[in-house]
């Protein structure tokens, strides 16, 4: 088999597969061909659109879970070569807008979509997970969640800056986005970023159970200590937070 043939097979391979279980939960498996870890690429847009069309048209699907086909990686982020290939700011903006649109469609699904996370869930991977209606993560040391774009001189471009503060509060969200700090699964659960932490052996079943239970109730605000409430829910407090964030950004 020639190198060209292998390249062509990788290019034509599907990244997302949908398997409908007997209990009515559809399991979406993401497995990027030719990559040791899953990364997000603009080239997946048409495949994701077709997948969403298939899901919407199948009335037998009661819920969804999305899991990685890689052994020790959920989604490590956006494809760096794709970002490096941007010649203009508009090209980068277009990629971010595409991500926002796709994740917005995931969030708008009328059936529960649960992310089953094992391994690195970073950058665009976390943005995708936050667009899901629930998140289950393994207690494995390989599982970390974060938005490390700042380490590349970037900010999250596909909804992370809007969704993260709603889940963990503005103060922690700014800290994560401006430092690239990554959270272990237990830390992420304590912060409100994931709903459950389970052993890897029952990850998929835990996600399926959550999907069958319906969309989690997100009406309750993030629980914050008194000082945190002053900082986040008063104009003076938010001014202090943004002032600190500005100073931190200028130090980069």
Q: What is the meaning of each model-derived region?
A:
Residues 1-67, 104:
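Conserved CoA-thioester-binding segment of acyl-CoA-metabolizing enzymes
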Residues 2-13, 42-46, 52, 172-174, ...:
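Intrinsically disordered, low-complexity segments enriched in small/flexible residues
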Residues 66, 79, 128-129, 188:
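Hydrophobic/aromatic residues within transmembrane alpha-helices
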Residues 68-102, 121, 151-153:
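Glycine- (often His-adjacent) and acidic-residue-rich active-site loop
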Residues 100, 105-152, 156:
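Glycine-rich beta-to-alpha active-site loop
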Residues 105, 128, 163-164, 175-176, ...:
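Hydrophobic/aromatic ligand-binding patch that stacks against planar heteroaromatic rings
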Residues 134, 175, 179-181, 196:
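Well-ordered beta-strand positions
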Residues 161-171:
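Hydrophobic, secondary-structure "cap" segments at the distal end of domains
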């Amino acid at each position: 088999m020639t190198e060209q043939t292998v390249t062509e097979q990788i290019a034509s391979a599907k990244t997302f597969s949908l398997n409908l279980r007997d209990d009515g939960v559809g399991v979406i498996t993401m497995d990027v061909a030719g990559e040791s870890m899953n990364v997000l690429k603009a080239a997946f847009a048409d495949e994701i659109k077709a997948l969403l069309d298939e899901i919407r048209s199948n009335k037998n699907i009661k819920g969804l879970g999305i899991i990685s086909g890689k052994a020790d990686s959920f989604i490590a982020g956006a494809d760096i070569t794709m970002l490096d290939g941007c010649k203009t700011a508009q090209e980068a903006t277009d990629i971010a807008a595409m991500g926002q649109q796709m994740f917005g469609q995931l969030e708008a699904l009328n059936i529960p979509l649960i992310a089953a996370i094992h391994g690195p869930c970073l950058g665009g991977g976390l943005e995708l997970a936050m667009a899901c209606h629930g998140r289950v993560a393994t207690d494995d040391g390989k599982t970390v969640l974060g938005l490390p774009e700042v380490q590349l001189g970037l900010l999250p471009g596909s909804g992370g800056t809007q969704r993260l503060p709603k889940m963990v509060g503005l103060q922690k969200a700014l800290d994560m986005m401006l430092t690239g700090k990554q959270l272990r699964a237990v830390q992420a659960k304590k912060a409100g970023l994931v709903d459950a932490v389970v052993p890897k052996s029952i990850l998929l079943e835990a996600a399926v159970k959550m999907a069958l239970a319906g969309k989690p109730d997100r009406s309750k605000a993030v629980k914050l200590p008194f000082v945190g409430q002053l900082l986040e829910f008063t104009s003076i407090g938010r001014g202090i937070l943004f002032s600190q964030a500005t100073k931190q950004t200028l130090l980069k």
